[in-house]
A protein has these predicted regions:
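Membrane-embedded and interfacial regions of multi-pass energy-transducing membrane proteins
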Residues: 1-27, 31-183
Length: 183
């Protein structure tokens, strides 16, 4: 909590950085939900794109975990009780629940050990997993090709060189588009 207070009160524009971080995370979820809705509308979960959808769902689960762990980091009453409730939900799983909750908390109660554990997961571990899943998601998309609302399979009609005649090459067009989107 002291570090958040320091950033908010003593670092120049620290309050803006913190609020941009939290608001940006919420905005990112809006974009993720729109992306998932588009995938549902286009039927992107159907064959042959099931692997792309699976990677997308795993990305979503990791994003939810990332958001939950970030929610705990201000270490206020809301974040403490939120962590208490969510970790105790894991404790209700039959047979392994108590040990799983103890493993997640790092102690018998939500404490500094939980905060340190969630900080490390929020800043290092989950972003690395997310990066790997995003690379796998894009690689699977590159292999099968993206979907469209018309349901036209662009990879069916290929030229003599094996390049689809009805589509746009992934590189450089989508690569540049994605880089511009990230920036």
């Amino acid at each position: 909590f002291a570090s958040v207070e320091y950033i908010m009160r003593d670092v120049n524009w620290g309050w803006l950085i913190r609020y941009m971080h939290s608001t940006g995370a919420s905005a990112f979820f809006v974009v993720v939900y729109m992306h998932m809705l588009r995938g549902l509308m286009y039927g992107s979960f159907k064959q042959p794109r099931e692997l792309i959808w699976l990677f997308g769902v795993l990305i979503y689960v990791c994003l939810m975990a990332e958001a939950f762990m970030g929610y705990l980091l201000p270490w206020g009453q809301m974040s403490y009780w939120g962590a208490q409730v969510i970790v105790n939900l894991f404790g209700t799983i039959p047979v392994i629940g108590d040990q799983l909750a103890l493993f997640i908390r790092g102690d018998y109660v939500v404490s500094d050990a939980t905060l340190n554990r969630f900080f490390a997961l929020h800043v290092i571990a989950v972003p690395i997993v997310l990066l790997g899943l995003v690379v796998a998601h894009i690689a699977a998309l590159h292999t099968v090709g993206s979907n469209n609302p018309d349901g036209v399979e662009i990879k069916k009609n290929k030229g003599a060189d094996g390049i689809p005649l009805d589509g746009i090459p992934f590189h450089p067009y989508y690569t540049v588009k994605d880089i511009v989107g990230v920036v």
